[in-house]
Amino acid sequence: MGTNLSVPNPLGFLPDHQLDPAFGANSTNPDWDFNPIKDHWPAANQVGVGAFGPGLTPPHGGILGWSPQAQGILTTVSTIPPPASTNRQSGRQPTPISPPLRDSHPQAMQWNSTALHQALQDPRVRGLYLPAGGSSSGTVNPAPNIASHISSISARTGDPVTIMENITSGFLGPLLVLQAGFFLLTRILTIPQSLDSWWTSLNFLGGSPVCLGQNSQSPTSNHSPTSCPPICPGYRWMCLRRFIIFLFILLLCLIFLLVLLDYQGMLPVCPLIPGSTTTSTGPCKTCTTPAQGNSKFPSCCCTKPTDGNCTCIPIPSSWAFAKYLWEWASVRFSWLSLLVPFVQWFVGLSPTVWLSAIWMMWYWGPSLYSIVSPFIPLLPIFFCLWVYI
């Protein structure tokens, strides 16, 4: 090294050995051969004191550079005080706190002129904003408000954080209702299939139900008549049976709803009897006075008018509603009147009726649950309607 120009250092692996102009060799920062502060190569045999101890750092700078600290020499540097322009006790004072133009944290304190003035009265705040020996009046005059009037208004950019409990309860209720409704729907949809199976089983007493359309012109594989494919001739009969079953279910629901409305007193209990005459008090349609005491719901039915007034007898509203339906149907279907003697005769045979009912319960008992079980999901719906309507 030394003055030997043949020793290359193209990438500057040795500190400050700048032989390549690309590493800053110029008139103010010459290369190694023209560096006035370089150590000559014969001095490299001497033991130097560097940052890593004796003999570990060459005397011509070492890997840490040319600074005294790199050579192991520690010097104390005096602290220079900051200029007056940056001193807190003199020069320009910082601008007092101003209300934010947009309040993106509504849960924080809302700033206004009164709250700002009270905050500036705090001695800790005054010590930061007033110079030494400042005003002795004890008040702080904030910077004049040159902003628009909108800056004094707290403009919220978002609503306060909603409590997670309210969010959970708000979503949990509809989800539970949706789940219960879906469960009831799936159970209700099994009612037509169960009734269809019972209906078709009446045609195959003592044997397994088999679709009769499989031996026709469009043969299909053996299947139940309750699950006919569309190509089976029995598919149309299956759809017809299920349509009748759906109408039957809707009729039951309608009857239950009308009975419920009648029980709540929302329907006239005493219908217009066919053939009744109009009296001075008008047609006998409603019961003016309950039969027994002041009942909340009407529980009587009008018979023939006596002396211009309705004579009420204590009959349950459900029986009154059944009588109303029978009278309504008798007016529109005259042939139903032919069934009255038969019904009266059948009711008169009460022991026979009870024996027949007992025999049917004993005969149909084992399969009665399978017939009634599909209607069980309807019970909660009927109960809710009964309670809340």
Curated annotation (Swiss-Prot):
Residue ranges that the UniProt entry lists as topological domain Virion surface: 2-170, 264-337, 388-389
Signal peptide bounds: none
Gene Ontology terms describing biological process: caveolin-mediated endocytosis of virus by host cell; fusion of virus membrane with host endosome membrane; virion attachment to host cell
Lipidation (N-myristoyl glycine): G2
Compartments reported by the entry: Virion membrane
InterPro entries linked: HBV_HBSAG
Region Pre-S, residue ranges: 2-163
Keywords recorded for this protein, A-Z: Acetylation, Caveolin-mediated endocytosis of virus by host, Fusion of virus membrane with host endosomal membrane, Fusion of virus membrane with host membrane, Glycoprotein, Host-virus interaction, Lipoprotein, Membrane, Myristate, Transmembrane, Transmembrane helix, Viral attachment to host cell, Viral envelope protein, Viral penetration into host cytoplasm, Virion, Virus endocytosis by host, Virus entry into host cell
Chain intervals for the UniProt region annotation (Pre-S2): 109-163
Major place of residence: virion
Keyword Transmembrane: yes
Region (Disordered): 77-103
Keyword Glycoprotein in annotation: yes
Summary of the protein's practical applications: Systematic vaccination of individuals at risk of exposure to the virus has been the main method of controlling the morbidity and mortality associated with hepatitis B. The first hepatitis B vaccine was manufactured by the purification and inactivation of HBsAg obtained from the plasma of chronic hepatitis B virus carriers. The vaccine is now produced by recombinant DNA techniques and expression of the S isoform in yeast cells. The pre-S region do not seem to induce strong enough antigenic response.
Protein's name according to its UniProt entry: Large envelope protein
Gene responsible for this protein: S
